Amino acid sequence: VPSGSMKPPILPGDRIVVDKLAYDLAVPFTWVRIFRWGEPKRGDVVTFDNPQDERLFVKRVIGVPGDVVELRRNRLFINGDKASYEPLGPDEIAELPIPNASSHRFFRESVLGDSRVIMVNRRATGTYSTFPPQEIPAGYYLMLGDNRDNSSDSRRIGLITRDRIMGRAHAVAFSVDLDKYYLPRLARFFTDLP
């Protein structure tokens, strides 16, 4: 993973395990699906081809077909339900593998039975921190990074079609610290993604 857009659960330098059979069977190196047996669910961490430049991205599914999703100053609303935001305590923040954590705020975001830890920049007002209610059409998904103020996601690249979704990420296989000469981060080896 080259960027910090999915911090805190996925860090730059993580090598993640992706189940490419989570939703369907595809012809290798194509978007041709042979058989489909599942659909991405709200809260799944998935990999997909960016429609703008074909790079592989990893983000969290926030909106599924039929959902009405809105973001107001980094506050999420899905189908009219406002997400709750519980600030993480100092002990919880200390356990996160985030350097310079003091420049961010960390919250446990919960909506419609799904929960995750997100981070927002203390100083950012962000032009992408708000978007009006948007109904997700059939065959499309809305993706957001957990690092809300530092993620190139559906707010910038648009909704993602189902056929572009490659699989569901579920673990970190191994991790290296890109800022420390690729030293291994042993504590992250073989850890599950929340």
Language-model-derived ranges and their functions:
Residues 1-6:
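Aromatic-capped interface at the extracytoplasmic side
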